[in-house]
Amino acid sequence: MKRAYNFNAGPSALPLPVLERAQKELLNFQNTGMSVMELSHRSKEYEAVHHAAKERLKRLLNVPDGYDILFLQGGASLQFSMVPMNLLTEGKIGCYVLTGAWSEKALKEAQKIGLTTVVASSKEANYTYIPPLDDVQWPKNAAYVHITSNNTIFGTQWKEFPNTPVDLVADMSSDILSRPFDVSQFALIYAGAQKNLGPSGVTVVILRNDLLERIPDGLPTMLDYRTHQKSNSLYNTPPTFAIYMLSLVLEWVEEQGGVAAMEERNQQKAAVLYEAIDESGGFYKPHAEKGSRSLMNVTFTLPNEELTKTFLAEAKERGFVGLGGHRSVGGCRASIYNAVPLEACEALASFMNEFRRRFA
């Protein structure tokens, strides 16, 4: 069976060995006579899956002592509310850096819950770059500063994470596991799984344990981080199959050489596509400024709408899937998360070059 070149923004490509392993184990997981989907979440077989996923993630990201890993539901979108509900206590201010649509949504939810301020933004430039935080005047009563590490729609990414005098919170949904970083720099990290971690259905939260002490009482039980930390993310039935798939993806990342090896591959993949853009003589125009370019989402436009439609139609015929840009940017977007192989990027670059020669 011929597999598509999958450049979808999320849900997105999964490693083929992971899919094949899941297929093999689907009907009879570890000789239980049941699928993972049929196991009780209180069974010792599922408990081992749950524990393995947590430990693998801890190893891969070098999560230090004093932090905990939670497996939640509701996607990163629910974290837009949970973060301020738990951390934005009375009289404190939530600081937000606006770098795209997802950070805007995070801010919008926080505004419903408490006091907020925008400390930096690149909205005026249609989010073509990551704004520096060097000259920020931090409020004395700042609770945290929230950033979005990678912006899928606009194709920008923080190259270095900021050292901030207040607790740093990050939505890493679209680039977690794509490069090494220091977890201890953050108070809380969250990530929906469906880009670099596995299929949709589970959300990873990594939080510093001392944050639990500042959570106000009276929150709805399921929206209180303490509920899930105390119960090892088993307070209610977790998304067991999604966590099983997460564990398989993490095992695959370890087999590839870990997060540093992923970064090297991702740099190679992105370089192939950005080279096709930069050497096109302006036929393909990048959305992001060079210093802020994402290794995960390569965004570009063609000279006009008609050519864009032709490009996307021909790309689809060649087996390239998911290349349409978001309506707020237009043009095209290639999402090249960890599971997208270098060969797919090389094939796309080759098609881009051929298309340019015909239509430039």
UniProtKB/Swiss-Prot annotation:
Reactions the enzyme catalyzes: O-phospho-L-serine + 2-oxoglutarate = 3-phosphooxypyruvate + L-glutamate; 4-(phosphooxy)-L-threonine + 2-oxoglutarate = (R)-3-hydroxy-2-oxo-4-phosphooxybutanoate + L-glutamate
Gene, per the UniProt record: serC
Compartments (UniProt record): Cytoplasm
Major enzyme class: transferase
PANTHER family assigned to the protein according to its UniProt record, in alphabetical order: PHOSPHOSERINE AMINOTRANSFERASE
UniProt-listed Pfam families: Aminotran_5 (PF00266)
Cofactor: pyridoxal 5'-phosphate
GO CC entries: cytoplasm
Record protein name field: Phosphoserine aminotransferase
GO biological process entries: L-serine biosynthetic process
Chain positions recorded as pyridoxal 5'-phosphate binding sites: A76, S77, W102, T152, D171, Q194, N236, T237
